Curated annotation (Swiss-Prot):
Belongs to the universal ribosomal protein uS15 family. Transmembrane segments: none annotated. Pfam families: Ribosomal_S15. Part of the 30S ribosomal subunit. Disulfide bonds: none annotated. This is Small ribosomal subunit protein uS15c. GO terms for biological process: translation.
Length: 87
């Protein structure tokens, strides 16, 4: 499973405060909220929370892309995230 392999890689290399770990946590929250919203389409509070988390993850990814392009590419490949058009 992709999740377990990514967790092991992140725990071996980085600490919990690292950008990669934060993006990983946001990605898990996004996937959980997305599956929740498929069942509860009118849960507007969860929709708002999802948008906030998406924004936070986007800002962290932009920071990582600016600071270390190689780590950014590896992370989006591991988490199966699409690259934004601005990067």
């Amino acid at each position: 499973m992709v999740k377990n392999s990514v967790i092991s890689v992140i725990f071996q290399e980085e600490k919990k405060g690292s950008v990669e770990f934060q993006v990983f946590n946001f990605t898990n929250k996004i996937r959980r909220l997305t599956s929740h919203l498929e069942l509860h389409k009118k849960d507007y509070l969860s929709q708002r929370g999802l948008k906030k988390i998406l924004g936070k993850r986007q800002r962290l990814l932009a920071y990582l892309a600016k600071k270390n392009r190689v780590r950014y590419k590896e992370l989006i490949n591991q988490l199966d995230i699409r690259e934004t058009k601005t990067h």
